[in-house]
Regions:
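C-terminal accessory segments of proteins
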Residues: 1-511
Length: 511
């Protein structure tokens, strides 16, 4: 429990359905949604600070700032949440004054967090909502009509309907989540949100090159650039951050729409909590002035522009808030640690698999491709054990993109036999998230699809030692983390309008 701070952020996964913190959050969101989009304290304006949907024509210097894939990812989002929290608190105070509610519920209100890793997995079948399900207040279309009400009779601003968009225009009609999200006992499996690897890092940010890759907690050093998905993800931004965005899907799976889903703010509150937890283990933030003195643009509860720097949001208990727990939901050590994700492919191409021109990924079952030529793959695998020719093997899935968010991350496997594509098993390579790689984001991230690279050197050695990597073609399997139901023969329209995640090619290269 945080000590000596004015506001304590609590875990929504441990709250009763309509805990006062969630009730008043819903009331404030509803009021903010009623404000004109030009009001800096409105729901629309605050969402546009993260990203601007194509339906919004207004412009502002604060819009579309969100840095991803660079070392400002954590301090920028921390400042973003802090000013948003103040706006919500002031809105709660406004509502309570109008309704003569005492004591003032805004006095101790703090933004909750969603600790999706709180419940660790068991071998028992999942028959009820876990901490990886959306908190109950976000799943219900209705909410109580008063702080102590028990009947759900009022429209709930925290709830978004599920929808499978049929086009970019249809996607942006109304905020929504991917089909199945609201009713899921777990939005994602534990392996996709386990923050153990991130929390275990000792370096905040590193410079990645073709020759070296140093895993880091935060994302790649970007100096003074507020990058958008152009550099390397840190472990925390990769898992759980990107995977949760992709798992909730809908507008949460889009950079331009994410902050318009009320669960966004609880997701990022948990990401911020994990940063505080990492710092509590005597890890250190960067001390470079280009990181400390970077200026961001936000608006406060009075609608006044504020331009704080990173150095104003440091520490375990930054500014005036702390967290209920810095130890719960910090993850558990995986049985097999997957390969590190690296920002770039290697230099010498050994084998490829082309999409001709693009390979669509199945939302229902594994998509398998073979790397060719097979003899080059076999030679490369064998050379891993030759001490005279040290080299790293880099597996890259090129030009990953989708039309609309698919509502699930994907798992990548190397030579996994049919029926053994388990992310806790030895063949698991890593994740592909389509957050930031969707065509619906338009010009916000106009650099095309992502390249996702993994250093599979140690994995190949481990598979060889265990006799699990025989000579012959290398097969890459890409599997939806949460397979979608297969549409029946009568659902031809559903098949035709389903998301179309895809990639351009796959390569195996050396460094």
């Amino acid at each position: 429990m945080a000590n000596g701070v004015a506001f304590v952020r609590r875990d929504a996964s441990n709250m009763r359905d309509w805990d006062p913190a969630l009730y008043w959050y819903a009331r404030a969101v509803g009021r903010m949604q009623q404000r004109p989009g030009t009001d800096p304290t409105s729901w629309v304006f605050q969402g546009c600070i993260h990203g601007v949907p194509p339906t919004i024509t207004e412009t502002n210097e604060a819009f579309s700032q969100c840095p991803h894939g660079g070392w400002f990812f954590l301090p920028w989002h921390r400042g973003y949440l802090w000013y948003f929290e103040r706006i919500v608190r002031a809105t709660i105070k406004e509502i309570a004054a109008e309704e003569n509610i005492t004591p003032d519920p805004s006095t101790g209100w703090a933004l909750p967090y969603w600790d999706y890793a709180l419940d660790t997995p068991t071998s028992d079948p999942i028959e009820d909502f876990t901490s990886r399900a959306l908190p109950a207040a976000f799943r219900s279309p209705k909410m109580p009509d008063s702080p102590n009400g028990t009947k759900l009779t009022v429209d709930n601003p925290l709830f978004l309907p599920e929808k499978q968009a049929t086009s970019t225009a249809d996607f942006w009609q109304t905020p929504h989540r991917s089909p199945g999200t609201n009713s899921a006992f777990e939005v994602l499996p534990y392996t996709d949100i386990n923050p153990f690897t991130a929390i275990s890092q000792t370096v905040f940010a590193a410079t990645h090159t073709r020759q070296t890759d140093q895993p880091s907690f935060g994302s790649e050093i970007s100096y003074t650039s507020m990058d958008h998905f152009r550099r390397g993800f840190g472990e925390l931004e990769n898992v759980p951050h990107n995977q949760v965005h992709g798992g909730v899907g809908g507008w949460m799976g889009s950079v331009a729409g994410a902050a318009r889903d009320p669960i966004f703010w609880l997701h990022h509150s948990n990401i911020d909590r994990l940063w505080s937890s990492w710092l509590s283990k005597d890890n250190l933030n960067p001390d470079h002035t280009s990181w400390l003195d970077q200026t961001f643009i936000f608006f406060d509860e009075n609608g006044q522009i504020q331009k704080p720097t990173s150095r104003e949001f440091l520490g375990i208990d930054p500014r005036d808030y702390g967290y209920e727990s810095l130890t719960d939901g910090n993850g558990t050590r995986p049985v097999v640690v997957p390969p590190a994700q690296v920002p770039e492919a290697g230099e010498r191409v050994l084998a490829t698999a082309a999409g001709n021109p693009r390979q669509l990924l199945s939302l229902h079952e594994p998509t398998e491709v073979s790397l060719e030529p097979a003899d080059a793959v076999s030679r490369a695998m064998r050379s891993m054990t030759a001490p005279s020719t040290p080299q790293n093997l880099i597996l890259t899935v090129h030009n990953v993109r989708t039309d609309v968010p698919p509502g699930t991350p994907f798992h990548v496997f190397l030579n996994g036999p049919s029926g053994e594509l388990d992310p806790a098993g030895p063949y698991f390579v890593g994740w592909i998230s389509f957050f930031g790689a969707a065509d619906v984001d338009g010009a916000l991230h106009d650099h095309g699809g992502h390249d996702v690279s993994f250093d599979v050197t140690e994995q190949v050695l481990r598979l060889q030692e265990q006799g699990l990597l025989p000579d012959g073609p290398a097969t890459i399997s890409i599997v939806p983390s949460v397979p979608q139901p297969v549409a029946g023969a009568a659902d031809a329209a559903a098949k035709a309008t389903a998301p179309q995640p895809s990639f351009g090619s796959i390569s195996l290269t050396t460094v």
